[in-house]
Amino acid sequence: MGTLPLDILLYIIDLLAGGDDEDIESLQNLSQVCKSMVPLCRKHLFSSLLLHYSKEDSERFSNLLLMNPEIARYVRNLNYRFYPPLSDHELNILDVLKKRSSLQSIRLSSPGMIEWNYLPESVQSSLVFLIQLPTVTRLDIDDIIGFPATALSGCSNLIDLRLGELKLAPPEVNQVILRSKITTPVSLHMWRTTLGLAALLDSASLHAGGPIIDFSRLQKAKFRVESQDDIGQVNELIKVTSRLEHFHLNRE
């Protein structure tokens, strides 16, 4: 019996993986048909990784990566929701992602406000490394207190930046930031994070190397603010933009 052409197989796989009704079970079954189907299906089966309250899930995926570390290269989207205490399995997963992944989208959040410095230093350094990967184009950070603003300076190819319920830690005075390319997002979405916006806008006077983020090429901006002071900070950001096409402001 003949086999289907590769382009037809790819079409079937993309069809199963597309849309909101992703057929995981069919993809899993298809990957077991023959060896050549494994990498084609893994591309979709492992494209998104959610780390959250289920320590059992983290343990299973950590063990899977230990046996098949090449799986990490299929992960494109990381959604990490902190549920302390963090397990060693979570750290193991981050370590493998650092070595083998080409993440494109990262979301860091917490079910309630969490202090950045509460996280183990090994987790902090791994997360900063990952968000600064040159392949990352979208970053979403929510519900974190004291996230270092300078960590954003190394996100060289960031296009879409989303910050919510976030309190950034400003750079230290005269702090030197080493980078090859300044962060220049095209889209910015901030809600209840105007203190963070102030830290980013004022950063140029605090350290050598210019501002942490260059907003001059911003094309889309959306803000949710709570006070007149917040609106003032948004106005300061608008002053440095030169390509803004879409702007939305919602006051609560």
Annotate each PLM feature:
Residues 14, 18, 39, 164-167, ...:
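Positions within ordered alpha-helical repeat solenoids
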Residues 55-63, 83-243:
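Leucine-rich repeat
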Residues 11, 244-248:
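C-terminal capping region of solenoid repeat domains
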Residues 2-92, 115-118:
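Hydrophobic regular-secondary-structure patch
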Residues 108, 249-251:
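A generic structural motif
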Residues 47, 74-76, 186, 217, ...:
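A generic secondary-structure signal marking the coil-to-beta-strand transition
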